[in-house]
C-alpha cells in the first residue's frame, strides 16, 4: 500500500511569488515600501501600516529556532513520528512555521535559539516547501 501523501499548499495570486521562489531555491519575503516592515505570510498589503506599496525580496534563509513541539503520534499523513513542528524566527524578523531536518527530533538536539538555515523539500513539480536544518559552522 502506498504511503499517504503530505498535504499540499494551494498557491493563490497573492502567494504565487513565494512558491515561485521556493521552486527556484529562494526564500522570498515582502517588505513594505512605506514603513519598511518585513512580513510573512505573503499578502497584498502591509500588516503594519496597510500600505499596498510592497516589494518582494530574496531573504537570507538564516534564522533561529524560536519554538517547537515534537509530535509522537501519526496525526498527519506523510509524516513519520517523531517529527518537530517548529517556529523559526528569520534573520529579517518574521516568524514562520516549518519542519526541522537533518537532526534528531529530540529535545536534546533541538535547542531553542539554535542557528538554522533554509533548505527546500520538493513535493512535486508545482510545490517545494521551505524546511530548516541546523546551520553549518
Regions found by a protein language model. Name each.
Residues 1-27, 135-137:
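A broadly conserved sequence feature marking short terminus-proximal activation segments
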